[in-house]
UniProtKB/Swiss-Prot annotation:
Domain of life: Eukaryota
Residues annotated as domain Globin: 1-142
InterPro entries in alphabetical order: Globin, Globin-like_sf, Globin/Proto, Hemoglobin_a-typ, Hemoglobin_oxygen_transport
Originating organism: Trematomus newnesi (Dusky notothen)
Protein name: Hemoglobin subunit alpha-2
């Protein structure tokens, strides 16, 4: 679980990166679709799935807005993300294993884009936060 220190670290790091969420989301989603091509099945209705394409960029921004929303609800992610969990479980039917894949790609992009700020402590706290976020999004699958 997230310690008080982890929560403080996540909030502080988010305040540094939140102005770049469109680029972070685009790169993370682009990487996921290339490195884990099986994830493309969820986006087969898009006209273009190439890295940086308009649909990828738009959905990457949507994802990162969701992450930002989760940061603001860090004290109770499960309750705070009920609606998003229901959407992914019942409407979109996304395999919850994909949350872990996307989380990994978000961490990779953080490391690339913010090498000085993405310290080992930030890495640990963000990894724990994204894992908690993934668990909260998976809540309605049970």
């Amino acid at each position: 679980s997230l310690s008080t220190k982890d929560k403080e670290t996540v909030k502080a790091f988010w305040s540094k990166v939140s102005g770049k969420t469109e680029d972070i989301g685009n790169d993370a989603l682009s990487r996921m679709l290339v490195v884990y091509p099986q994830t493309k099945i969820y986006f087969s209705h898009w006209k273009e799935l190439t890295p940086g394409s308009a649909p990828v960029r738009k959905h990457g921004m949507t994802v990162m807005k969701g992450v930002g929303d989760a940061v603001s609800k860090i004290e109770d992610l499960t309750a705070g993300l009920t609606e998003l969990s229901e959407l992914h479980a019942f409407t979109l039917r996304v395999d919850p294993g994909n949350f872990k894949i996307l989380s990994h790609n978000i961490l990779v992009v953080f490391a690339i884009m913010f090498p000085n700020d993405f310290t080992p402590q930030v890495h640990v706290s963000m990894d724990k936060f994204l894992a908690a976020l993934s668990r909260a999004l998976s809540e309605k699958y049970r």
